[in-house]
Amino acid sequence: MTTQKIVPTKSTDGSKLFRHQAKFVAGAMNINQIPNFSLPEIAFVGKSNVGKSSLINTICNNKNLAKVSNTAGRTRQINFFNLADKLIIVDLPGYGFANVPISVKEQWGVLISYYLRNSYNLRLVNLLIDSRRGIKENDKKVADLLLANKREFQIIFTKSDKVTDHKNLHDEAHNFLATLNYSCNVMYVSNRSKEGARELKASLAKCIKPQK
């Protein structure tokens, strides 16, 4: 990766794909339970309570698809959702401030790390950052892991309706990516206002296999 520039997102249309109903197909609480669907996978990763499950529900137009809780650490396994037999959406457990025993946190860390390192079908990782909190040390460690394993990722600032000025976030992301010597999309999304949903869908739709 040689460029330090943030590449803006182009709003190509992903709405056709996301008109289809996504469905839960598997959950994995340990590495032996991780399935292989032979379909492209896109993963959502971020700190506990950053809004991963809510965002998945928003882009899939189904508020009951991924279980949502105000309590950090409720997603305790990797959840897999099939979208129209074209794409697998992967909801990873949160890292950081989950109010769970250290042994459980370590188990989640192993599970998340193993999946991100070894998934053959993983095409894109969405690194979710709470707009109110900014990029933290744990987020940087995940980005380092992704780069070390040559995983493509994009930064998604969630809860963008909670902040009035995106410039500071933009500058923070720019500086962060410069230190990584990496270029990627940076998006701002809100489950409440639906800001950024169209752009995010478009970026995910690009990961599906082309029709032969």
From Swiss-Prot:
Indicate the segments forming the EngB-type G domain, all copies: 38-210
For the ligand (Mg(2+)), the binding residues are 53, 75
Q: Name one GO molecular function term.
A: metal ion binding
Tell me which UniProt keywords the record has, alphabetically.
Answer: Cell cycle, Cell division, GTP-binding, Magnesium, Metal-binding, Nucleotide-binding, Septation
Keyword Ligase appears in the UniProt entry: no
The source's superkingdom equals Bacteria
Coiled-coil stretches are: none
One Gene Ontology BP term is: division septum assembly
Kindly list the cofactors needed. Answer: Mg(2+)
Q: Which residues bind GTP?
A: 46-53, 73-77, 91-94, 158-161, 189-191
Q: Which InterPro entries match?
A: G_ENGB_dom, GTP-bd, GTP-bd_ribosome_bio_YsxC, P-loop_NTPase
Q: What family is reported?
A: Belongs to the TRAFAC class TrmE-Era-EngA-EngB-Septin-like GTPase superfamily. EngB GTPase family.
Physiological role? Necessary for normal cell division and for the maintenance of normal septation.
Q: What is the recorded name of this protein?
A: Probable GTP-binding protein EngB
- Species this protein is from: Rickettsia peacockii (strain Rustic)
Which gene produces this protein?
Answer: engB
